[in-house]
Amino acid sequence: MTAVKEERQHALLSASSAHRWLECPPSARLEESLPDTTSSAAAEGTIAHALAEIKALNYFYPADMSKQKMSRRIAKLKKEELWNDEMQGYTDVYLDFLKAASIEYPSKPYVAIEKTISYDNYAREGFGTADCIMIGGNTLHVIDFKYGKGVEVSPENNPQLMLYALGAMDVYAMIYDIQHIKLSIVQPRTGNPGWTWELSKEQILLFGENVKHVSALAWEGKGDYNPGPEQCRFCRAGDLCRARAESLMDLEAAENMLPPLITWDEAAMYLRRGNGLVAWYNKLKDSALKEILSGGRVPGYKAVSGRTTRVWTDRDKAFQALNDAGYPDTVLRETKDLSISQIEKIVGKKEFTELAKDLVVKQPGAPALVP
């Protein structure tokens, strides 16, 4: 957990933010000028990563992480406010992947868990924490555990994992002749038990050469701003970035198009350019409200009280008074089934599957437009 925090605090060109600064070099320094905030989802992910680390260490290094020590560590994690029992099942999926990956080697591989990796040869003062690194023969395997479920992450051309691979090749060059690289992401909450992409030493080194040029620009805060859905999604400067605002607002140029009805080719262009417009607008509104509430000024806007709601001051006492007046609970309360996901969360994924696997079907979702 500490290593993750250090990366956020000190690595300007961090591996976890590489998908931003490699696409939009000036964004690294721009983000540096803004306060970093941690969402509840990120905090939840930190707990899940700590649990995954404990389990992996117990399996690969039981002398250092005995069952007793593991139990004590997990008991401590369970006291965290955002702890959820379903983390146990999801981290087991990750551990199963690590076990399977390790036995693919002809002999026992070297395994590093939560390894701090420097790739300073490619990006100045760049480092990050790799969840798991395995090396055996001439094969390097970088494995990353993702606890998020909102956005599925692919290992293919994944800059975070590729930077870890470059750093690992430098660190272990004197011991291993690495020629083959595997990059894997385990993201169980999206239904992904493990997705692997493979590349050669030549391919990863070519990526590294490209990184050197872009990272030099990013370090100096130079280069061109390049707004886009992927790099802007989690950028701290995303809602106030001038380049992004101008890119999105250029959609208003439609009035110059003739004839009055746009073609489907033009519609496709607007769909691409408008991707992220609503999310950006809502984030901008939130930032403006925070500015006003903190004493700042946003011309033409003010903060007002939202819609009022009524709440009980003493719910139990209120219901007792209503019961005494002749209104039973059957009138005052609703009874409804929990959703399948809620029931699975209570019962546990494994037991739920055993009890109800033949009684649950997946209905096709409504059609959705994707690029």
Where are the regions a protein language model picked out?
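Short acidic (Asp/Glu) and glycine-rich catalytic loops that position anionic groups and cofactors
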Residues: 25-31, 143, 184-195, 236-237, ...
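Hydrophobic/aromatic-lined pockets within catalytic cores
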Residues: 56, 60, 147-150, 165-173, ...
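Metal-dependent nuclease catalytic cores that hydrolyze phosphodiester bonds in DNA/RNA
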Residues: 1-140, 180-182, 193, 274
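Mg2+/Mn2+-dependent nuclease catalytic core
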Residues: 106-219, 344
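Short, charged, low-complexity amphipathic alpha-helix
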Residues: 205-276
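Extended, charge-rich alpha-helical segments
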Residues: 272, 279-371
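Short, polar/flexible loop-turn hinges at active-site or ligand-entry regions and domain interfaces
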Residues: 33-41, 60, 149-153, 171-175, ...
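Active-site-proximal structural scaffolding
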Residues: 125, 157, 228, 267-273, ...
